[in-house]
Design a protein with these regions (language model features):
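Short, internal strand/loop/helix patches
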Residues: 99-138, 145
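Thiol-/selenol-based redox modules, centered on thioredoxin-like
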Residues: 132-133, 137-188
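Short active-site neighborhood of thiol/selenol oxidoreductases, capturing the structured segment around
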Residues: 40-61, 166
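Structural microenvironment flanking redox-active thiols in thiol-disulfide oxidoreductases
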Residues: 61-102, 110-119
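Short, thiol/selenol-centered motifs that function as redox-active sites or metal-ligating centers
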Residues: 54-63, 88, 128, 185-188
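Bacterial Sec-dependent N-terminal signal peptides
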Residues: 1-23
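A short beta-strand-turn-helix
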Residues: 27-47
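Loop/turn elements at helix/coil->beta-strand transitions in domains of secreted/extracellular proteins
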Residues: 45-47, 77-80, 104-106, 133
Length: 188
């Protein structure tokens, strides 16, 4: 009897954890044309890279080249990239100017109520979340170790955390490092 109750509790916790992660696709955001955008195509990809950005954050400005290189590197692979602006402080024009000024080749979506950032626990920009096809978080944190403190950058990047996580997913291997600490500007 006790064994049965324990198994029932474990099953409930697993179910609740699984459902909470699967709420990610149901969050409604706005694209830059004012249309509702849902991250509901997760199942079409092995993984989705969600990048939290801020047009006003110097590190987000600096990382646009790296983000573009990643998008190019994984073009044609079952990896989707989505940029999230989690703030109501930026107008569509502000976001479009950021995208144009830094030649950012990324689909940007507005999260004015910070629903997705709260759901995922994002607090910094730039911060990435690699989400699996079923909505499970495979990796979260920094893109790489270029920035190691606010205003301080390495001349040589020695850890490519996001690339390592994506490569593991594409190779059907477990992601070794599941979480790192992102460095950047706070999401407000």
């Amino acid at each position: 009897m006790i064994k049965r109750q324990i198994l029932l509790w474990i099953g409930c916790f697993l179910f609740l954890g699984f459902t909470a992660q699967n709420d990610i696709p149901n969050i409604r955001l706005m694209d830059l044309k004012g249309k509702i955008f849902r991250i509901n195509q997760l199942h079409k990809y092995k993984a989705t890279v969600i990048v939290f950005l801020s047009p006003a954050c110097p590190l987000c400005q600096s990382y646009t080249l790296t983000i573009n290189q990643l998008i190019k590197k994984y073009n044609g692979k079952p990896i989707q990239f989505i940029g999230i602006i989690a703030s109501k402080d930026f107008s569509v024009d502000d976001i479009l100017n950021y995208k144009r000024s830094y030649k950012l080749n990324l689909n940007l979506v507005r999260d004015t109520e910070c629903l997705l950032s709260k759901k995922l626990g994002a607090s910094i920009t730039p911060e990435v979340f690699l989400v699996g096809a079923m909505g499970e978080i495979k990796y979260s944190g920094r893109i790489d170790n270029w920035a190691y403190e606010l205003g301080k950058k390495r001349t040589i990047i020695t850890e490519h955390d996001l690339i390592d996580a994506i490569e593991a997913i594409l190779s059907d291997k477990p992601v070794k490092t599941k979480k790192t600490k992102a460095v950047g500007c706070f999401i407000e």
